[in-house]
Amino acid sequence: MASYFPHGATNSHASMRSPSPAASPLSPPPQRSNALSNRLTSVLSASYADSDIRDALETLSLRGIHNTAETRRQLRLDVQKEVVDSNAEIVRDFGTVAEQLQRIGAVISSLNQTCEEMRQHIFLAKQDTTPVLEEASALVSQKQESETKQQLLDAFAKHFIIPEEELPVLTSLEEPIDDHFFNVLARVKQVHHDCEVLLEGENQRLGLELMEKSSRTLNSAYQKLFRWIQKEFQSLNLEDPRISSSIRRALRVLAERPSLFHSCLDFFAEARDYALSDAFHYALTDAVSGTGGDRSVKPIEFSAHDPLRYVGDMLAWVHSSTVSEREALEALFVADGDEIAKGIQAGLSSEPWSRIDEEEEVSFDGQKALSDLVNRDLIGVSRSLRQRVELVIQGHDDPVSCYKIVHLFLFYRATFSKLLGPQSNLTELMETLEKFAFTRFERIMREQVTVLSSDHSALTPPEDLSAPEFFLDALEALTSLMKTHDASLGTEDADRAPAAENQFTPVLRAAFDPYLELARSSATELQDATARAMYTTNILLTARSTISAFPFASATHLPPISTALSDLRTDLLGIQHRYLLDASGLGLLLTALEPFSPSTTTTITTTKPKPDTNPEDTDTDTTLPTKKPPPNIAAIATLPAFQPDALIATSQQLDDFLPSALMDATENLKRLQSATFVKSVTEEAVEAFCRDFEFVEGMIIGADEAAGRVDIARVDGDGDNEAEIHEGEELKLEQEMGLRRLFPRTTGEIRVLLS
């Protein structure tokens, strides 16, 4: 922005500070110069930071005034002139406003006068119309009260009063049971319920009269409904999937009267019992005699010769009928949810006199009631079924078929328990028949065992010592029983507790244990202990192979069989070991070396012969645990069994035995039915034989070594006695030959030949 002061102002200002020249005659007087100087000084001393000066300068700059001498001289005048012009214009504007305000005041005065006149007219009109309005208001209030009373009267009559023309729908037997009947009945029930409100007031007469009238109407309606349902039940076809909805609705309504409802159910159960009994009899005997039936369906009685099929067909029919009956009754009583249960619950609450215990909690179980109704419907069928089943079981002697029938009852007991509950008649009937059939099964098994025990020919062991025929037949029957049990339900308990008794344990006690004991007792017919052991082993091996495939059978009976087999195996091992010792001749050497055995050097056994017996056969009377000094091992050469001739004969017998030893040992137990069992017993017997031979070999070597040391010492110590010297030379000659040279076989050779 251009400066308000010209460029030369500074110089002039500076010149003012310089010493003034000499006064001219034309110069102004000194006072004026001082005033101007003071003025300039005050102007120049003003700070540019002053906001007023800054605003003034900005305003001056906005006016676009040029900083000239003329402008500076006229500035004040121009500004004052502008102020005067502005004030004059404002005065003119205020004059115009004053004129307009005067006109507005005149208009307001005119309006006030007009309003006052109107107020006077209104006041006069109000005075004239007030009585008329008061009278009209009173009339309107009276009209509203009359209308309200009329509405209340209409509502009361509509709600509490049943038209006379609708009452015959509930009471007349000629009127049908349809939707109109149920609608009117529902309305009467609502009126009867709402009458309780009328009884809460001071004047109870109207409420009592209406409640009495509605009660009579309801009783008549429920009686009519009860008779109609009984009539419908007589012609009701439960096999028809399209059961009338009206009868289901009638049952729901009748449930509000528990006494009538239960009477109706009793009538229904009696009718269904008769119908199902007749249908069962028809299925048993007259299935093909009907005119419209399926000619391919034969009566159940046609299979009476086969007890299992006969009983199974009857149970299948009963199960099918039970399922159909329950489904039909569910469609009849439970298809609409728990409406009947709610109705019975409400009826029980409204009939406290029907409770046995006044403090008993009122409750109704719809599913239990349905199962009870099905049970009642099948009472006649259950009675007929029980009679026929008991006759069939009593007249049949096949234990396998009898046990299969037991499992049929077991299966259907679980089925009926799920269908009708564990306390239902059919479930209890299945349990009763199951016990009856199993009792018959046990009786049959006992009779068979009794017959076998008196048959000597059947108890005679076979020539090949195999299991007897009657025992094989019993195991075959037992296999059928176990397969039946394994394929049926209810065997999970054996898997959970394999060491405990299970459902099949009583069967084993009846069909297995007696035959096993009878077979084992027949072994007493054999005089030979080896044959007796092999015969008993064959019996137990056959029994074990039969039951081991079934965990529920092996859980309880395999351990005792295994224990008995272990004992027999020990006996057969001793027999086989003795056979090897006797056939090889090693037994004679072991018998001669018994005094040198470590087990005989610690005790002294005193024996005496039995009376009237061979002195060699002795019984041990006492065993004294006294210390016995070990005999001199060199004395073995003096034993009879170790004399050269006897020892050479024994060695020759051993050589003759070894080539066919295994075959001969196996042949000794050839009548055992298990080759694996024979092999294991023979291998252990061979191992025991090798240990015995090793003992004999060690004793022979020890005797040779001991004899050499003793004989040399005896010759050197007694040289003066010629007889003793001569005897020593003979013994030395025998020593040079040695027992080992007479019995050259080694343990290694024996193991190789017997491997």
UniProtKB/Swiss-Prot annotation:
The keyword Membrane applies. It comes from the Eukaryota. Pfam families: COG6_C, COG6_N. It is a peripheral membrane protein. One of its GO terms (cellular component) is Golgi membrane. Residues 12-25 have a biased composition (Low complexity). Keywords: Golgi apparatus, Membrane, Protein transport, Transport. Belongs to the COG6 family. Acts as a component of the peripheral membrane COG complex that is involved in intra-Golgi protein trafficking. COG is located at the cis-Golgi, and regulates tethering of retrograde intra-Golgi vesicles and possibly a number of other membrane trafficking events. This is Conserved oligomeric Golgi complex subunit 6. It comes from Aspergillus clavatus (strain ATCC 1007 / CBS 513.65 / DSM 816 / NCTC 3887 / NRRL 1 / QM 1276 / 107).
